[in-house]
């Protein structure tokens, strides 16, 4: 079951990095433009 834990940690780290990069940008661009 170690693989499951490692996968969860990897996804969590990627999510945190993604959020950090996303929030680092100024909220000038509307969220509707992404979709």
From Swiss-Prot:
Pfam families listed in its UniProt record: PsbT (PF01405)
Domain of life: Eukaryota
GO BP annotation list: photosynthesis
Membrane-topology annotation of the record: Single-pass membrane protein
TM helices/strands, residue ranges: 3-23
Cellular component annotations (GO), alphabetically ordered: chloroplast thylakoid membrane; photosystem II reaction center
Regions annotated as coiled coil: none
Keyword set, alphabetical order: Chloroplast, Membrane, Photosynthesis, Photosystem II, Plastid, Thylakoid, Transmembrane, Transmembrane helix
Protein's cellular compartments: Plastid, Chloroplast thylakoid membrane
Subunit structure: PSII is composed of 1 copy each of membrane proteins PsbA, PsbB, PsbC, PsbD, PsbE, PsbF, PsbH, PsbI, PsbJ, PsbK, PsbL, PsbM, PsbT, PsbY, PsbZ, Psb30/Ycf12, at least 3 peripheral proteins of the oxygen-evolving complex and a large number of cofactors. It forms dimeric complexes.
Family to which the UniProt record says this protein belongs: Belongs to the PsbT family.
HAMAP family per UniProt: PSII_PsbT (MF_00808)
Purpose: Found at the monomer-monomer interface of the photosystem II (PS II) dimer, plays a role in assembly and dimerization of PSII. PSII is a light-driven water plastoquinone oxidoreductase, using light energy to abstract electrons from H(2)O, generating a proton gradient subsequently used for ATP formation.
Protein name (Swiss-Prot/TrEMBL): Photosystem II reaction center protein T
Species assigned in the record: Coffea arabica (Arabian coffee)
Gene (name only): psbT
